[in-house]
């Protein structure tokens, strides 16, 4: 048995007349401007204050890391595709900067 279309449309129309947002909008505005943005600012400041040059750790030749069973198909075969000589060691150790 089908519902009468008239009663269904009245229920939807009356729900749309209510206040949009209300206290919910105030809550999200407070969370955005009172918590989220200051938190991002503090994290940015913390990151900026602790940024700086750090000495790289001593190379320890673990036998289970940097295993080369066959050479890479690019370059000299020993460097990975996104190799950074200042950060990434080779199987024999760091490259001289």
Curated annotation (Swiss-Prot):
Q: Quote the transit peptide annotation as a residue range.
A: 1-12
Give the stretches traversing the membrane: 25-49
| Membrane-side (Mitochondrial intermembrane) residue stretches | 50-97
Output the GO biological process annotations, alphabetical, semicolon-separated: mitochondrial electron transport, cytochrome c to oxygen
The superkingdom listed in its UniProt entry is: Eukaryota
One Pfam family from the record: COX6A
- Which locations, inside or outside the cell, does it occupy? Mitochondrion inner membrane
For this UniProt entry, the molecular function terms from Gene Ontology, in alphabetical order, are: enzyme regulator activity; oxidoreductase activity
Q: What keyword terms does UniProt attach to this protein?
A: Membrane, Mitochondrion, Mitochondrion inner membrane, Oxidoreductase, Transit peptide, Transmembrane, Transmembrane helix
What does this protein do, in the record's words? Component of the cytochrome c oxidase, the last enzyme in the mitochondrial electron transport chain which drives oxidative phosphorylation. The respiratory chain contains 3 multisubunit complexes succinate dehydrogenase (complex II, CII), ubiquinol-cytochrome c oxidoreductase (cytochrome b-c1 complex, complex III, CIII) and cytochrome c oxidase (complex IV, CIV), that cooperate to transfer electrons derived from NADH and succinate to molecular oxygen, creating an electrochemical gradient over the inner membrane that drives transmembrane transport and the ATP synthase.
What is the annotated quaternary arrangement, including any partners? Component of the cytochrome c oxidase (complex IV, CIV), a multisubunit enzyme composed of 14 subunits. The complex is composed of a catalytic core of 3 subunits MT-CO1, MT-CO2 and MT-CO3, encoded in the mitochondrial DNA, and 11 supernumerary subunits COX4I1 (or COX4I2), COX5A, COX5B, COX6A2 (or COX6A1), COX6B1 (or COX6B2), COX6C, COX7A1 (or COX7A2), COX7B, COX7C, COX8B and NDUFA4, which are encoded in the nuclear genome.
Descriptive protein name:
Cytochrome c oxidase subunit 6A2, mitochondrial
State the organism's lineage.
Eukaryota, Metazoa, Chordata, Craniata, Vertebrata
Gene that specifies this protein:
COX6A2
């Amino acid at each position: 048995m089908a519902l009468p279309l008239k009663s269904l449309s009245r229920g939807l129309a009356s729900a749309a007349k209510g206040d949009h947002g209300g206290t919910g909008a105030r809550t999200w505005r407070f969370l955005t401007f009172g918590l989220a943005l200051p938190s991002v600012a503090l994290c940015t400041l913390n990151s900026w204050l602790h940024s700086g040059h750090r000495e790289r750790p001593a190379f320890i030749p673990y036998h289970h890391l940097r295993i080369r069973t066959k050479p890479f198909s690019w370059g000299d075969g020993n460097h990975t595709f996104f190799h950074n000589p200042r950060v990434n060691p080779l199987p024999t150790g760091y490259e001289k900067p």
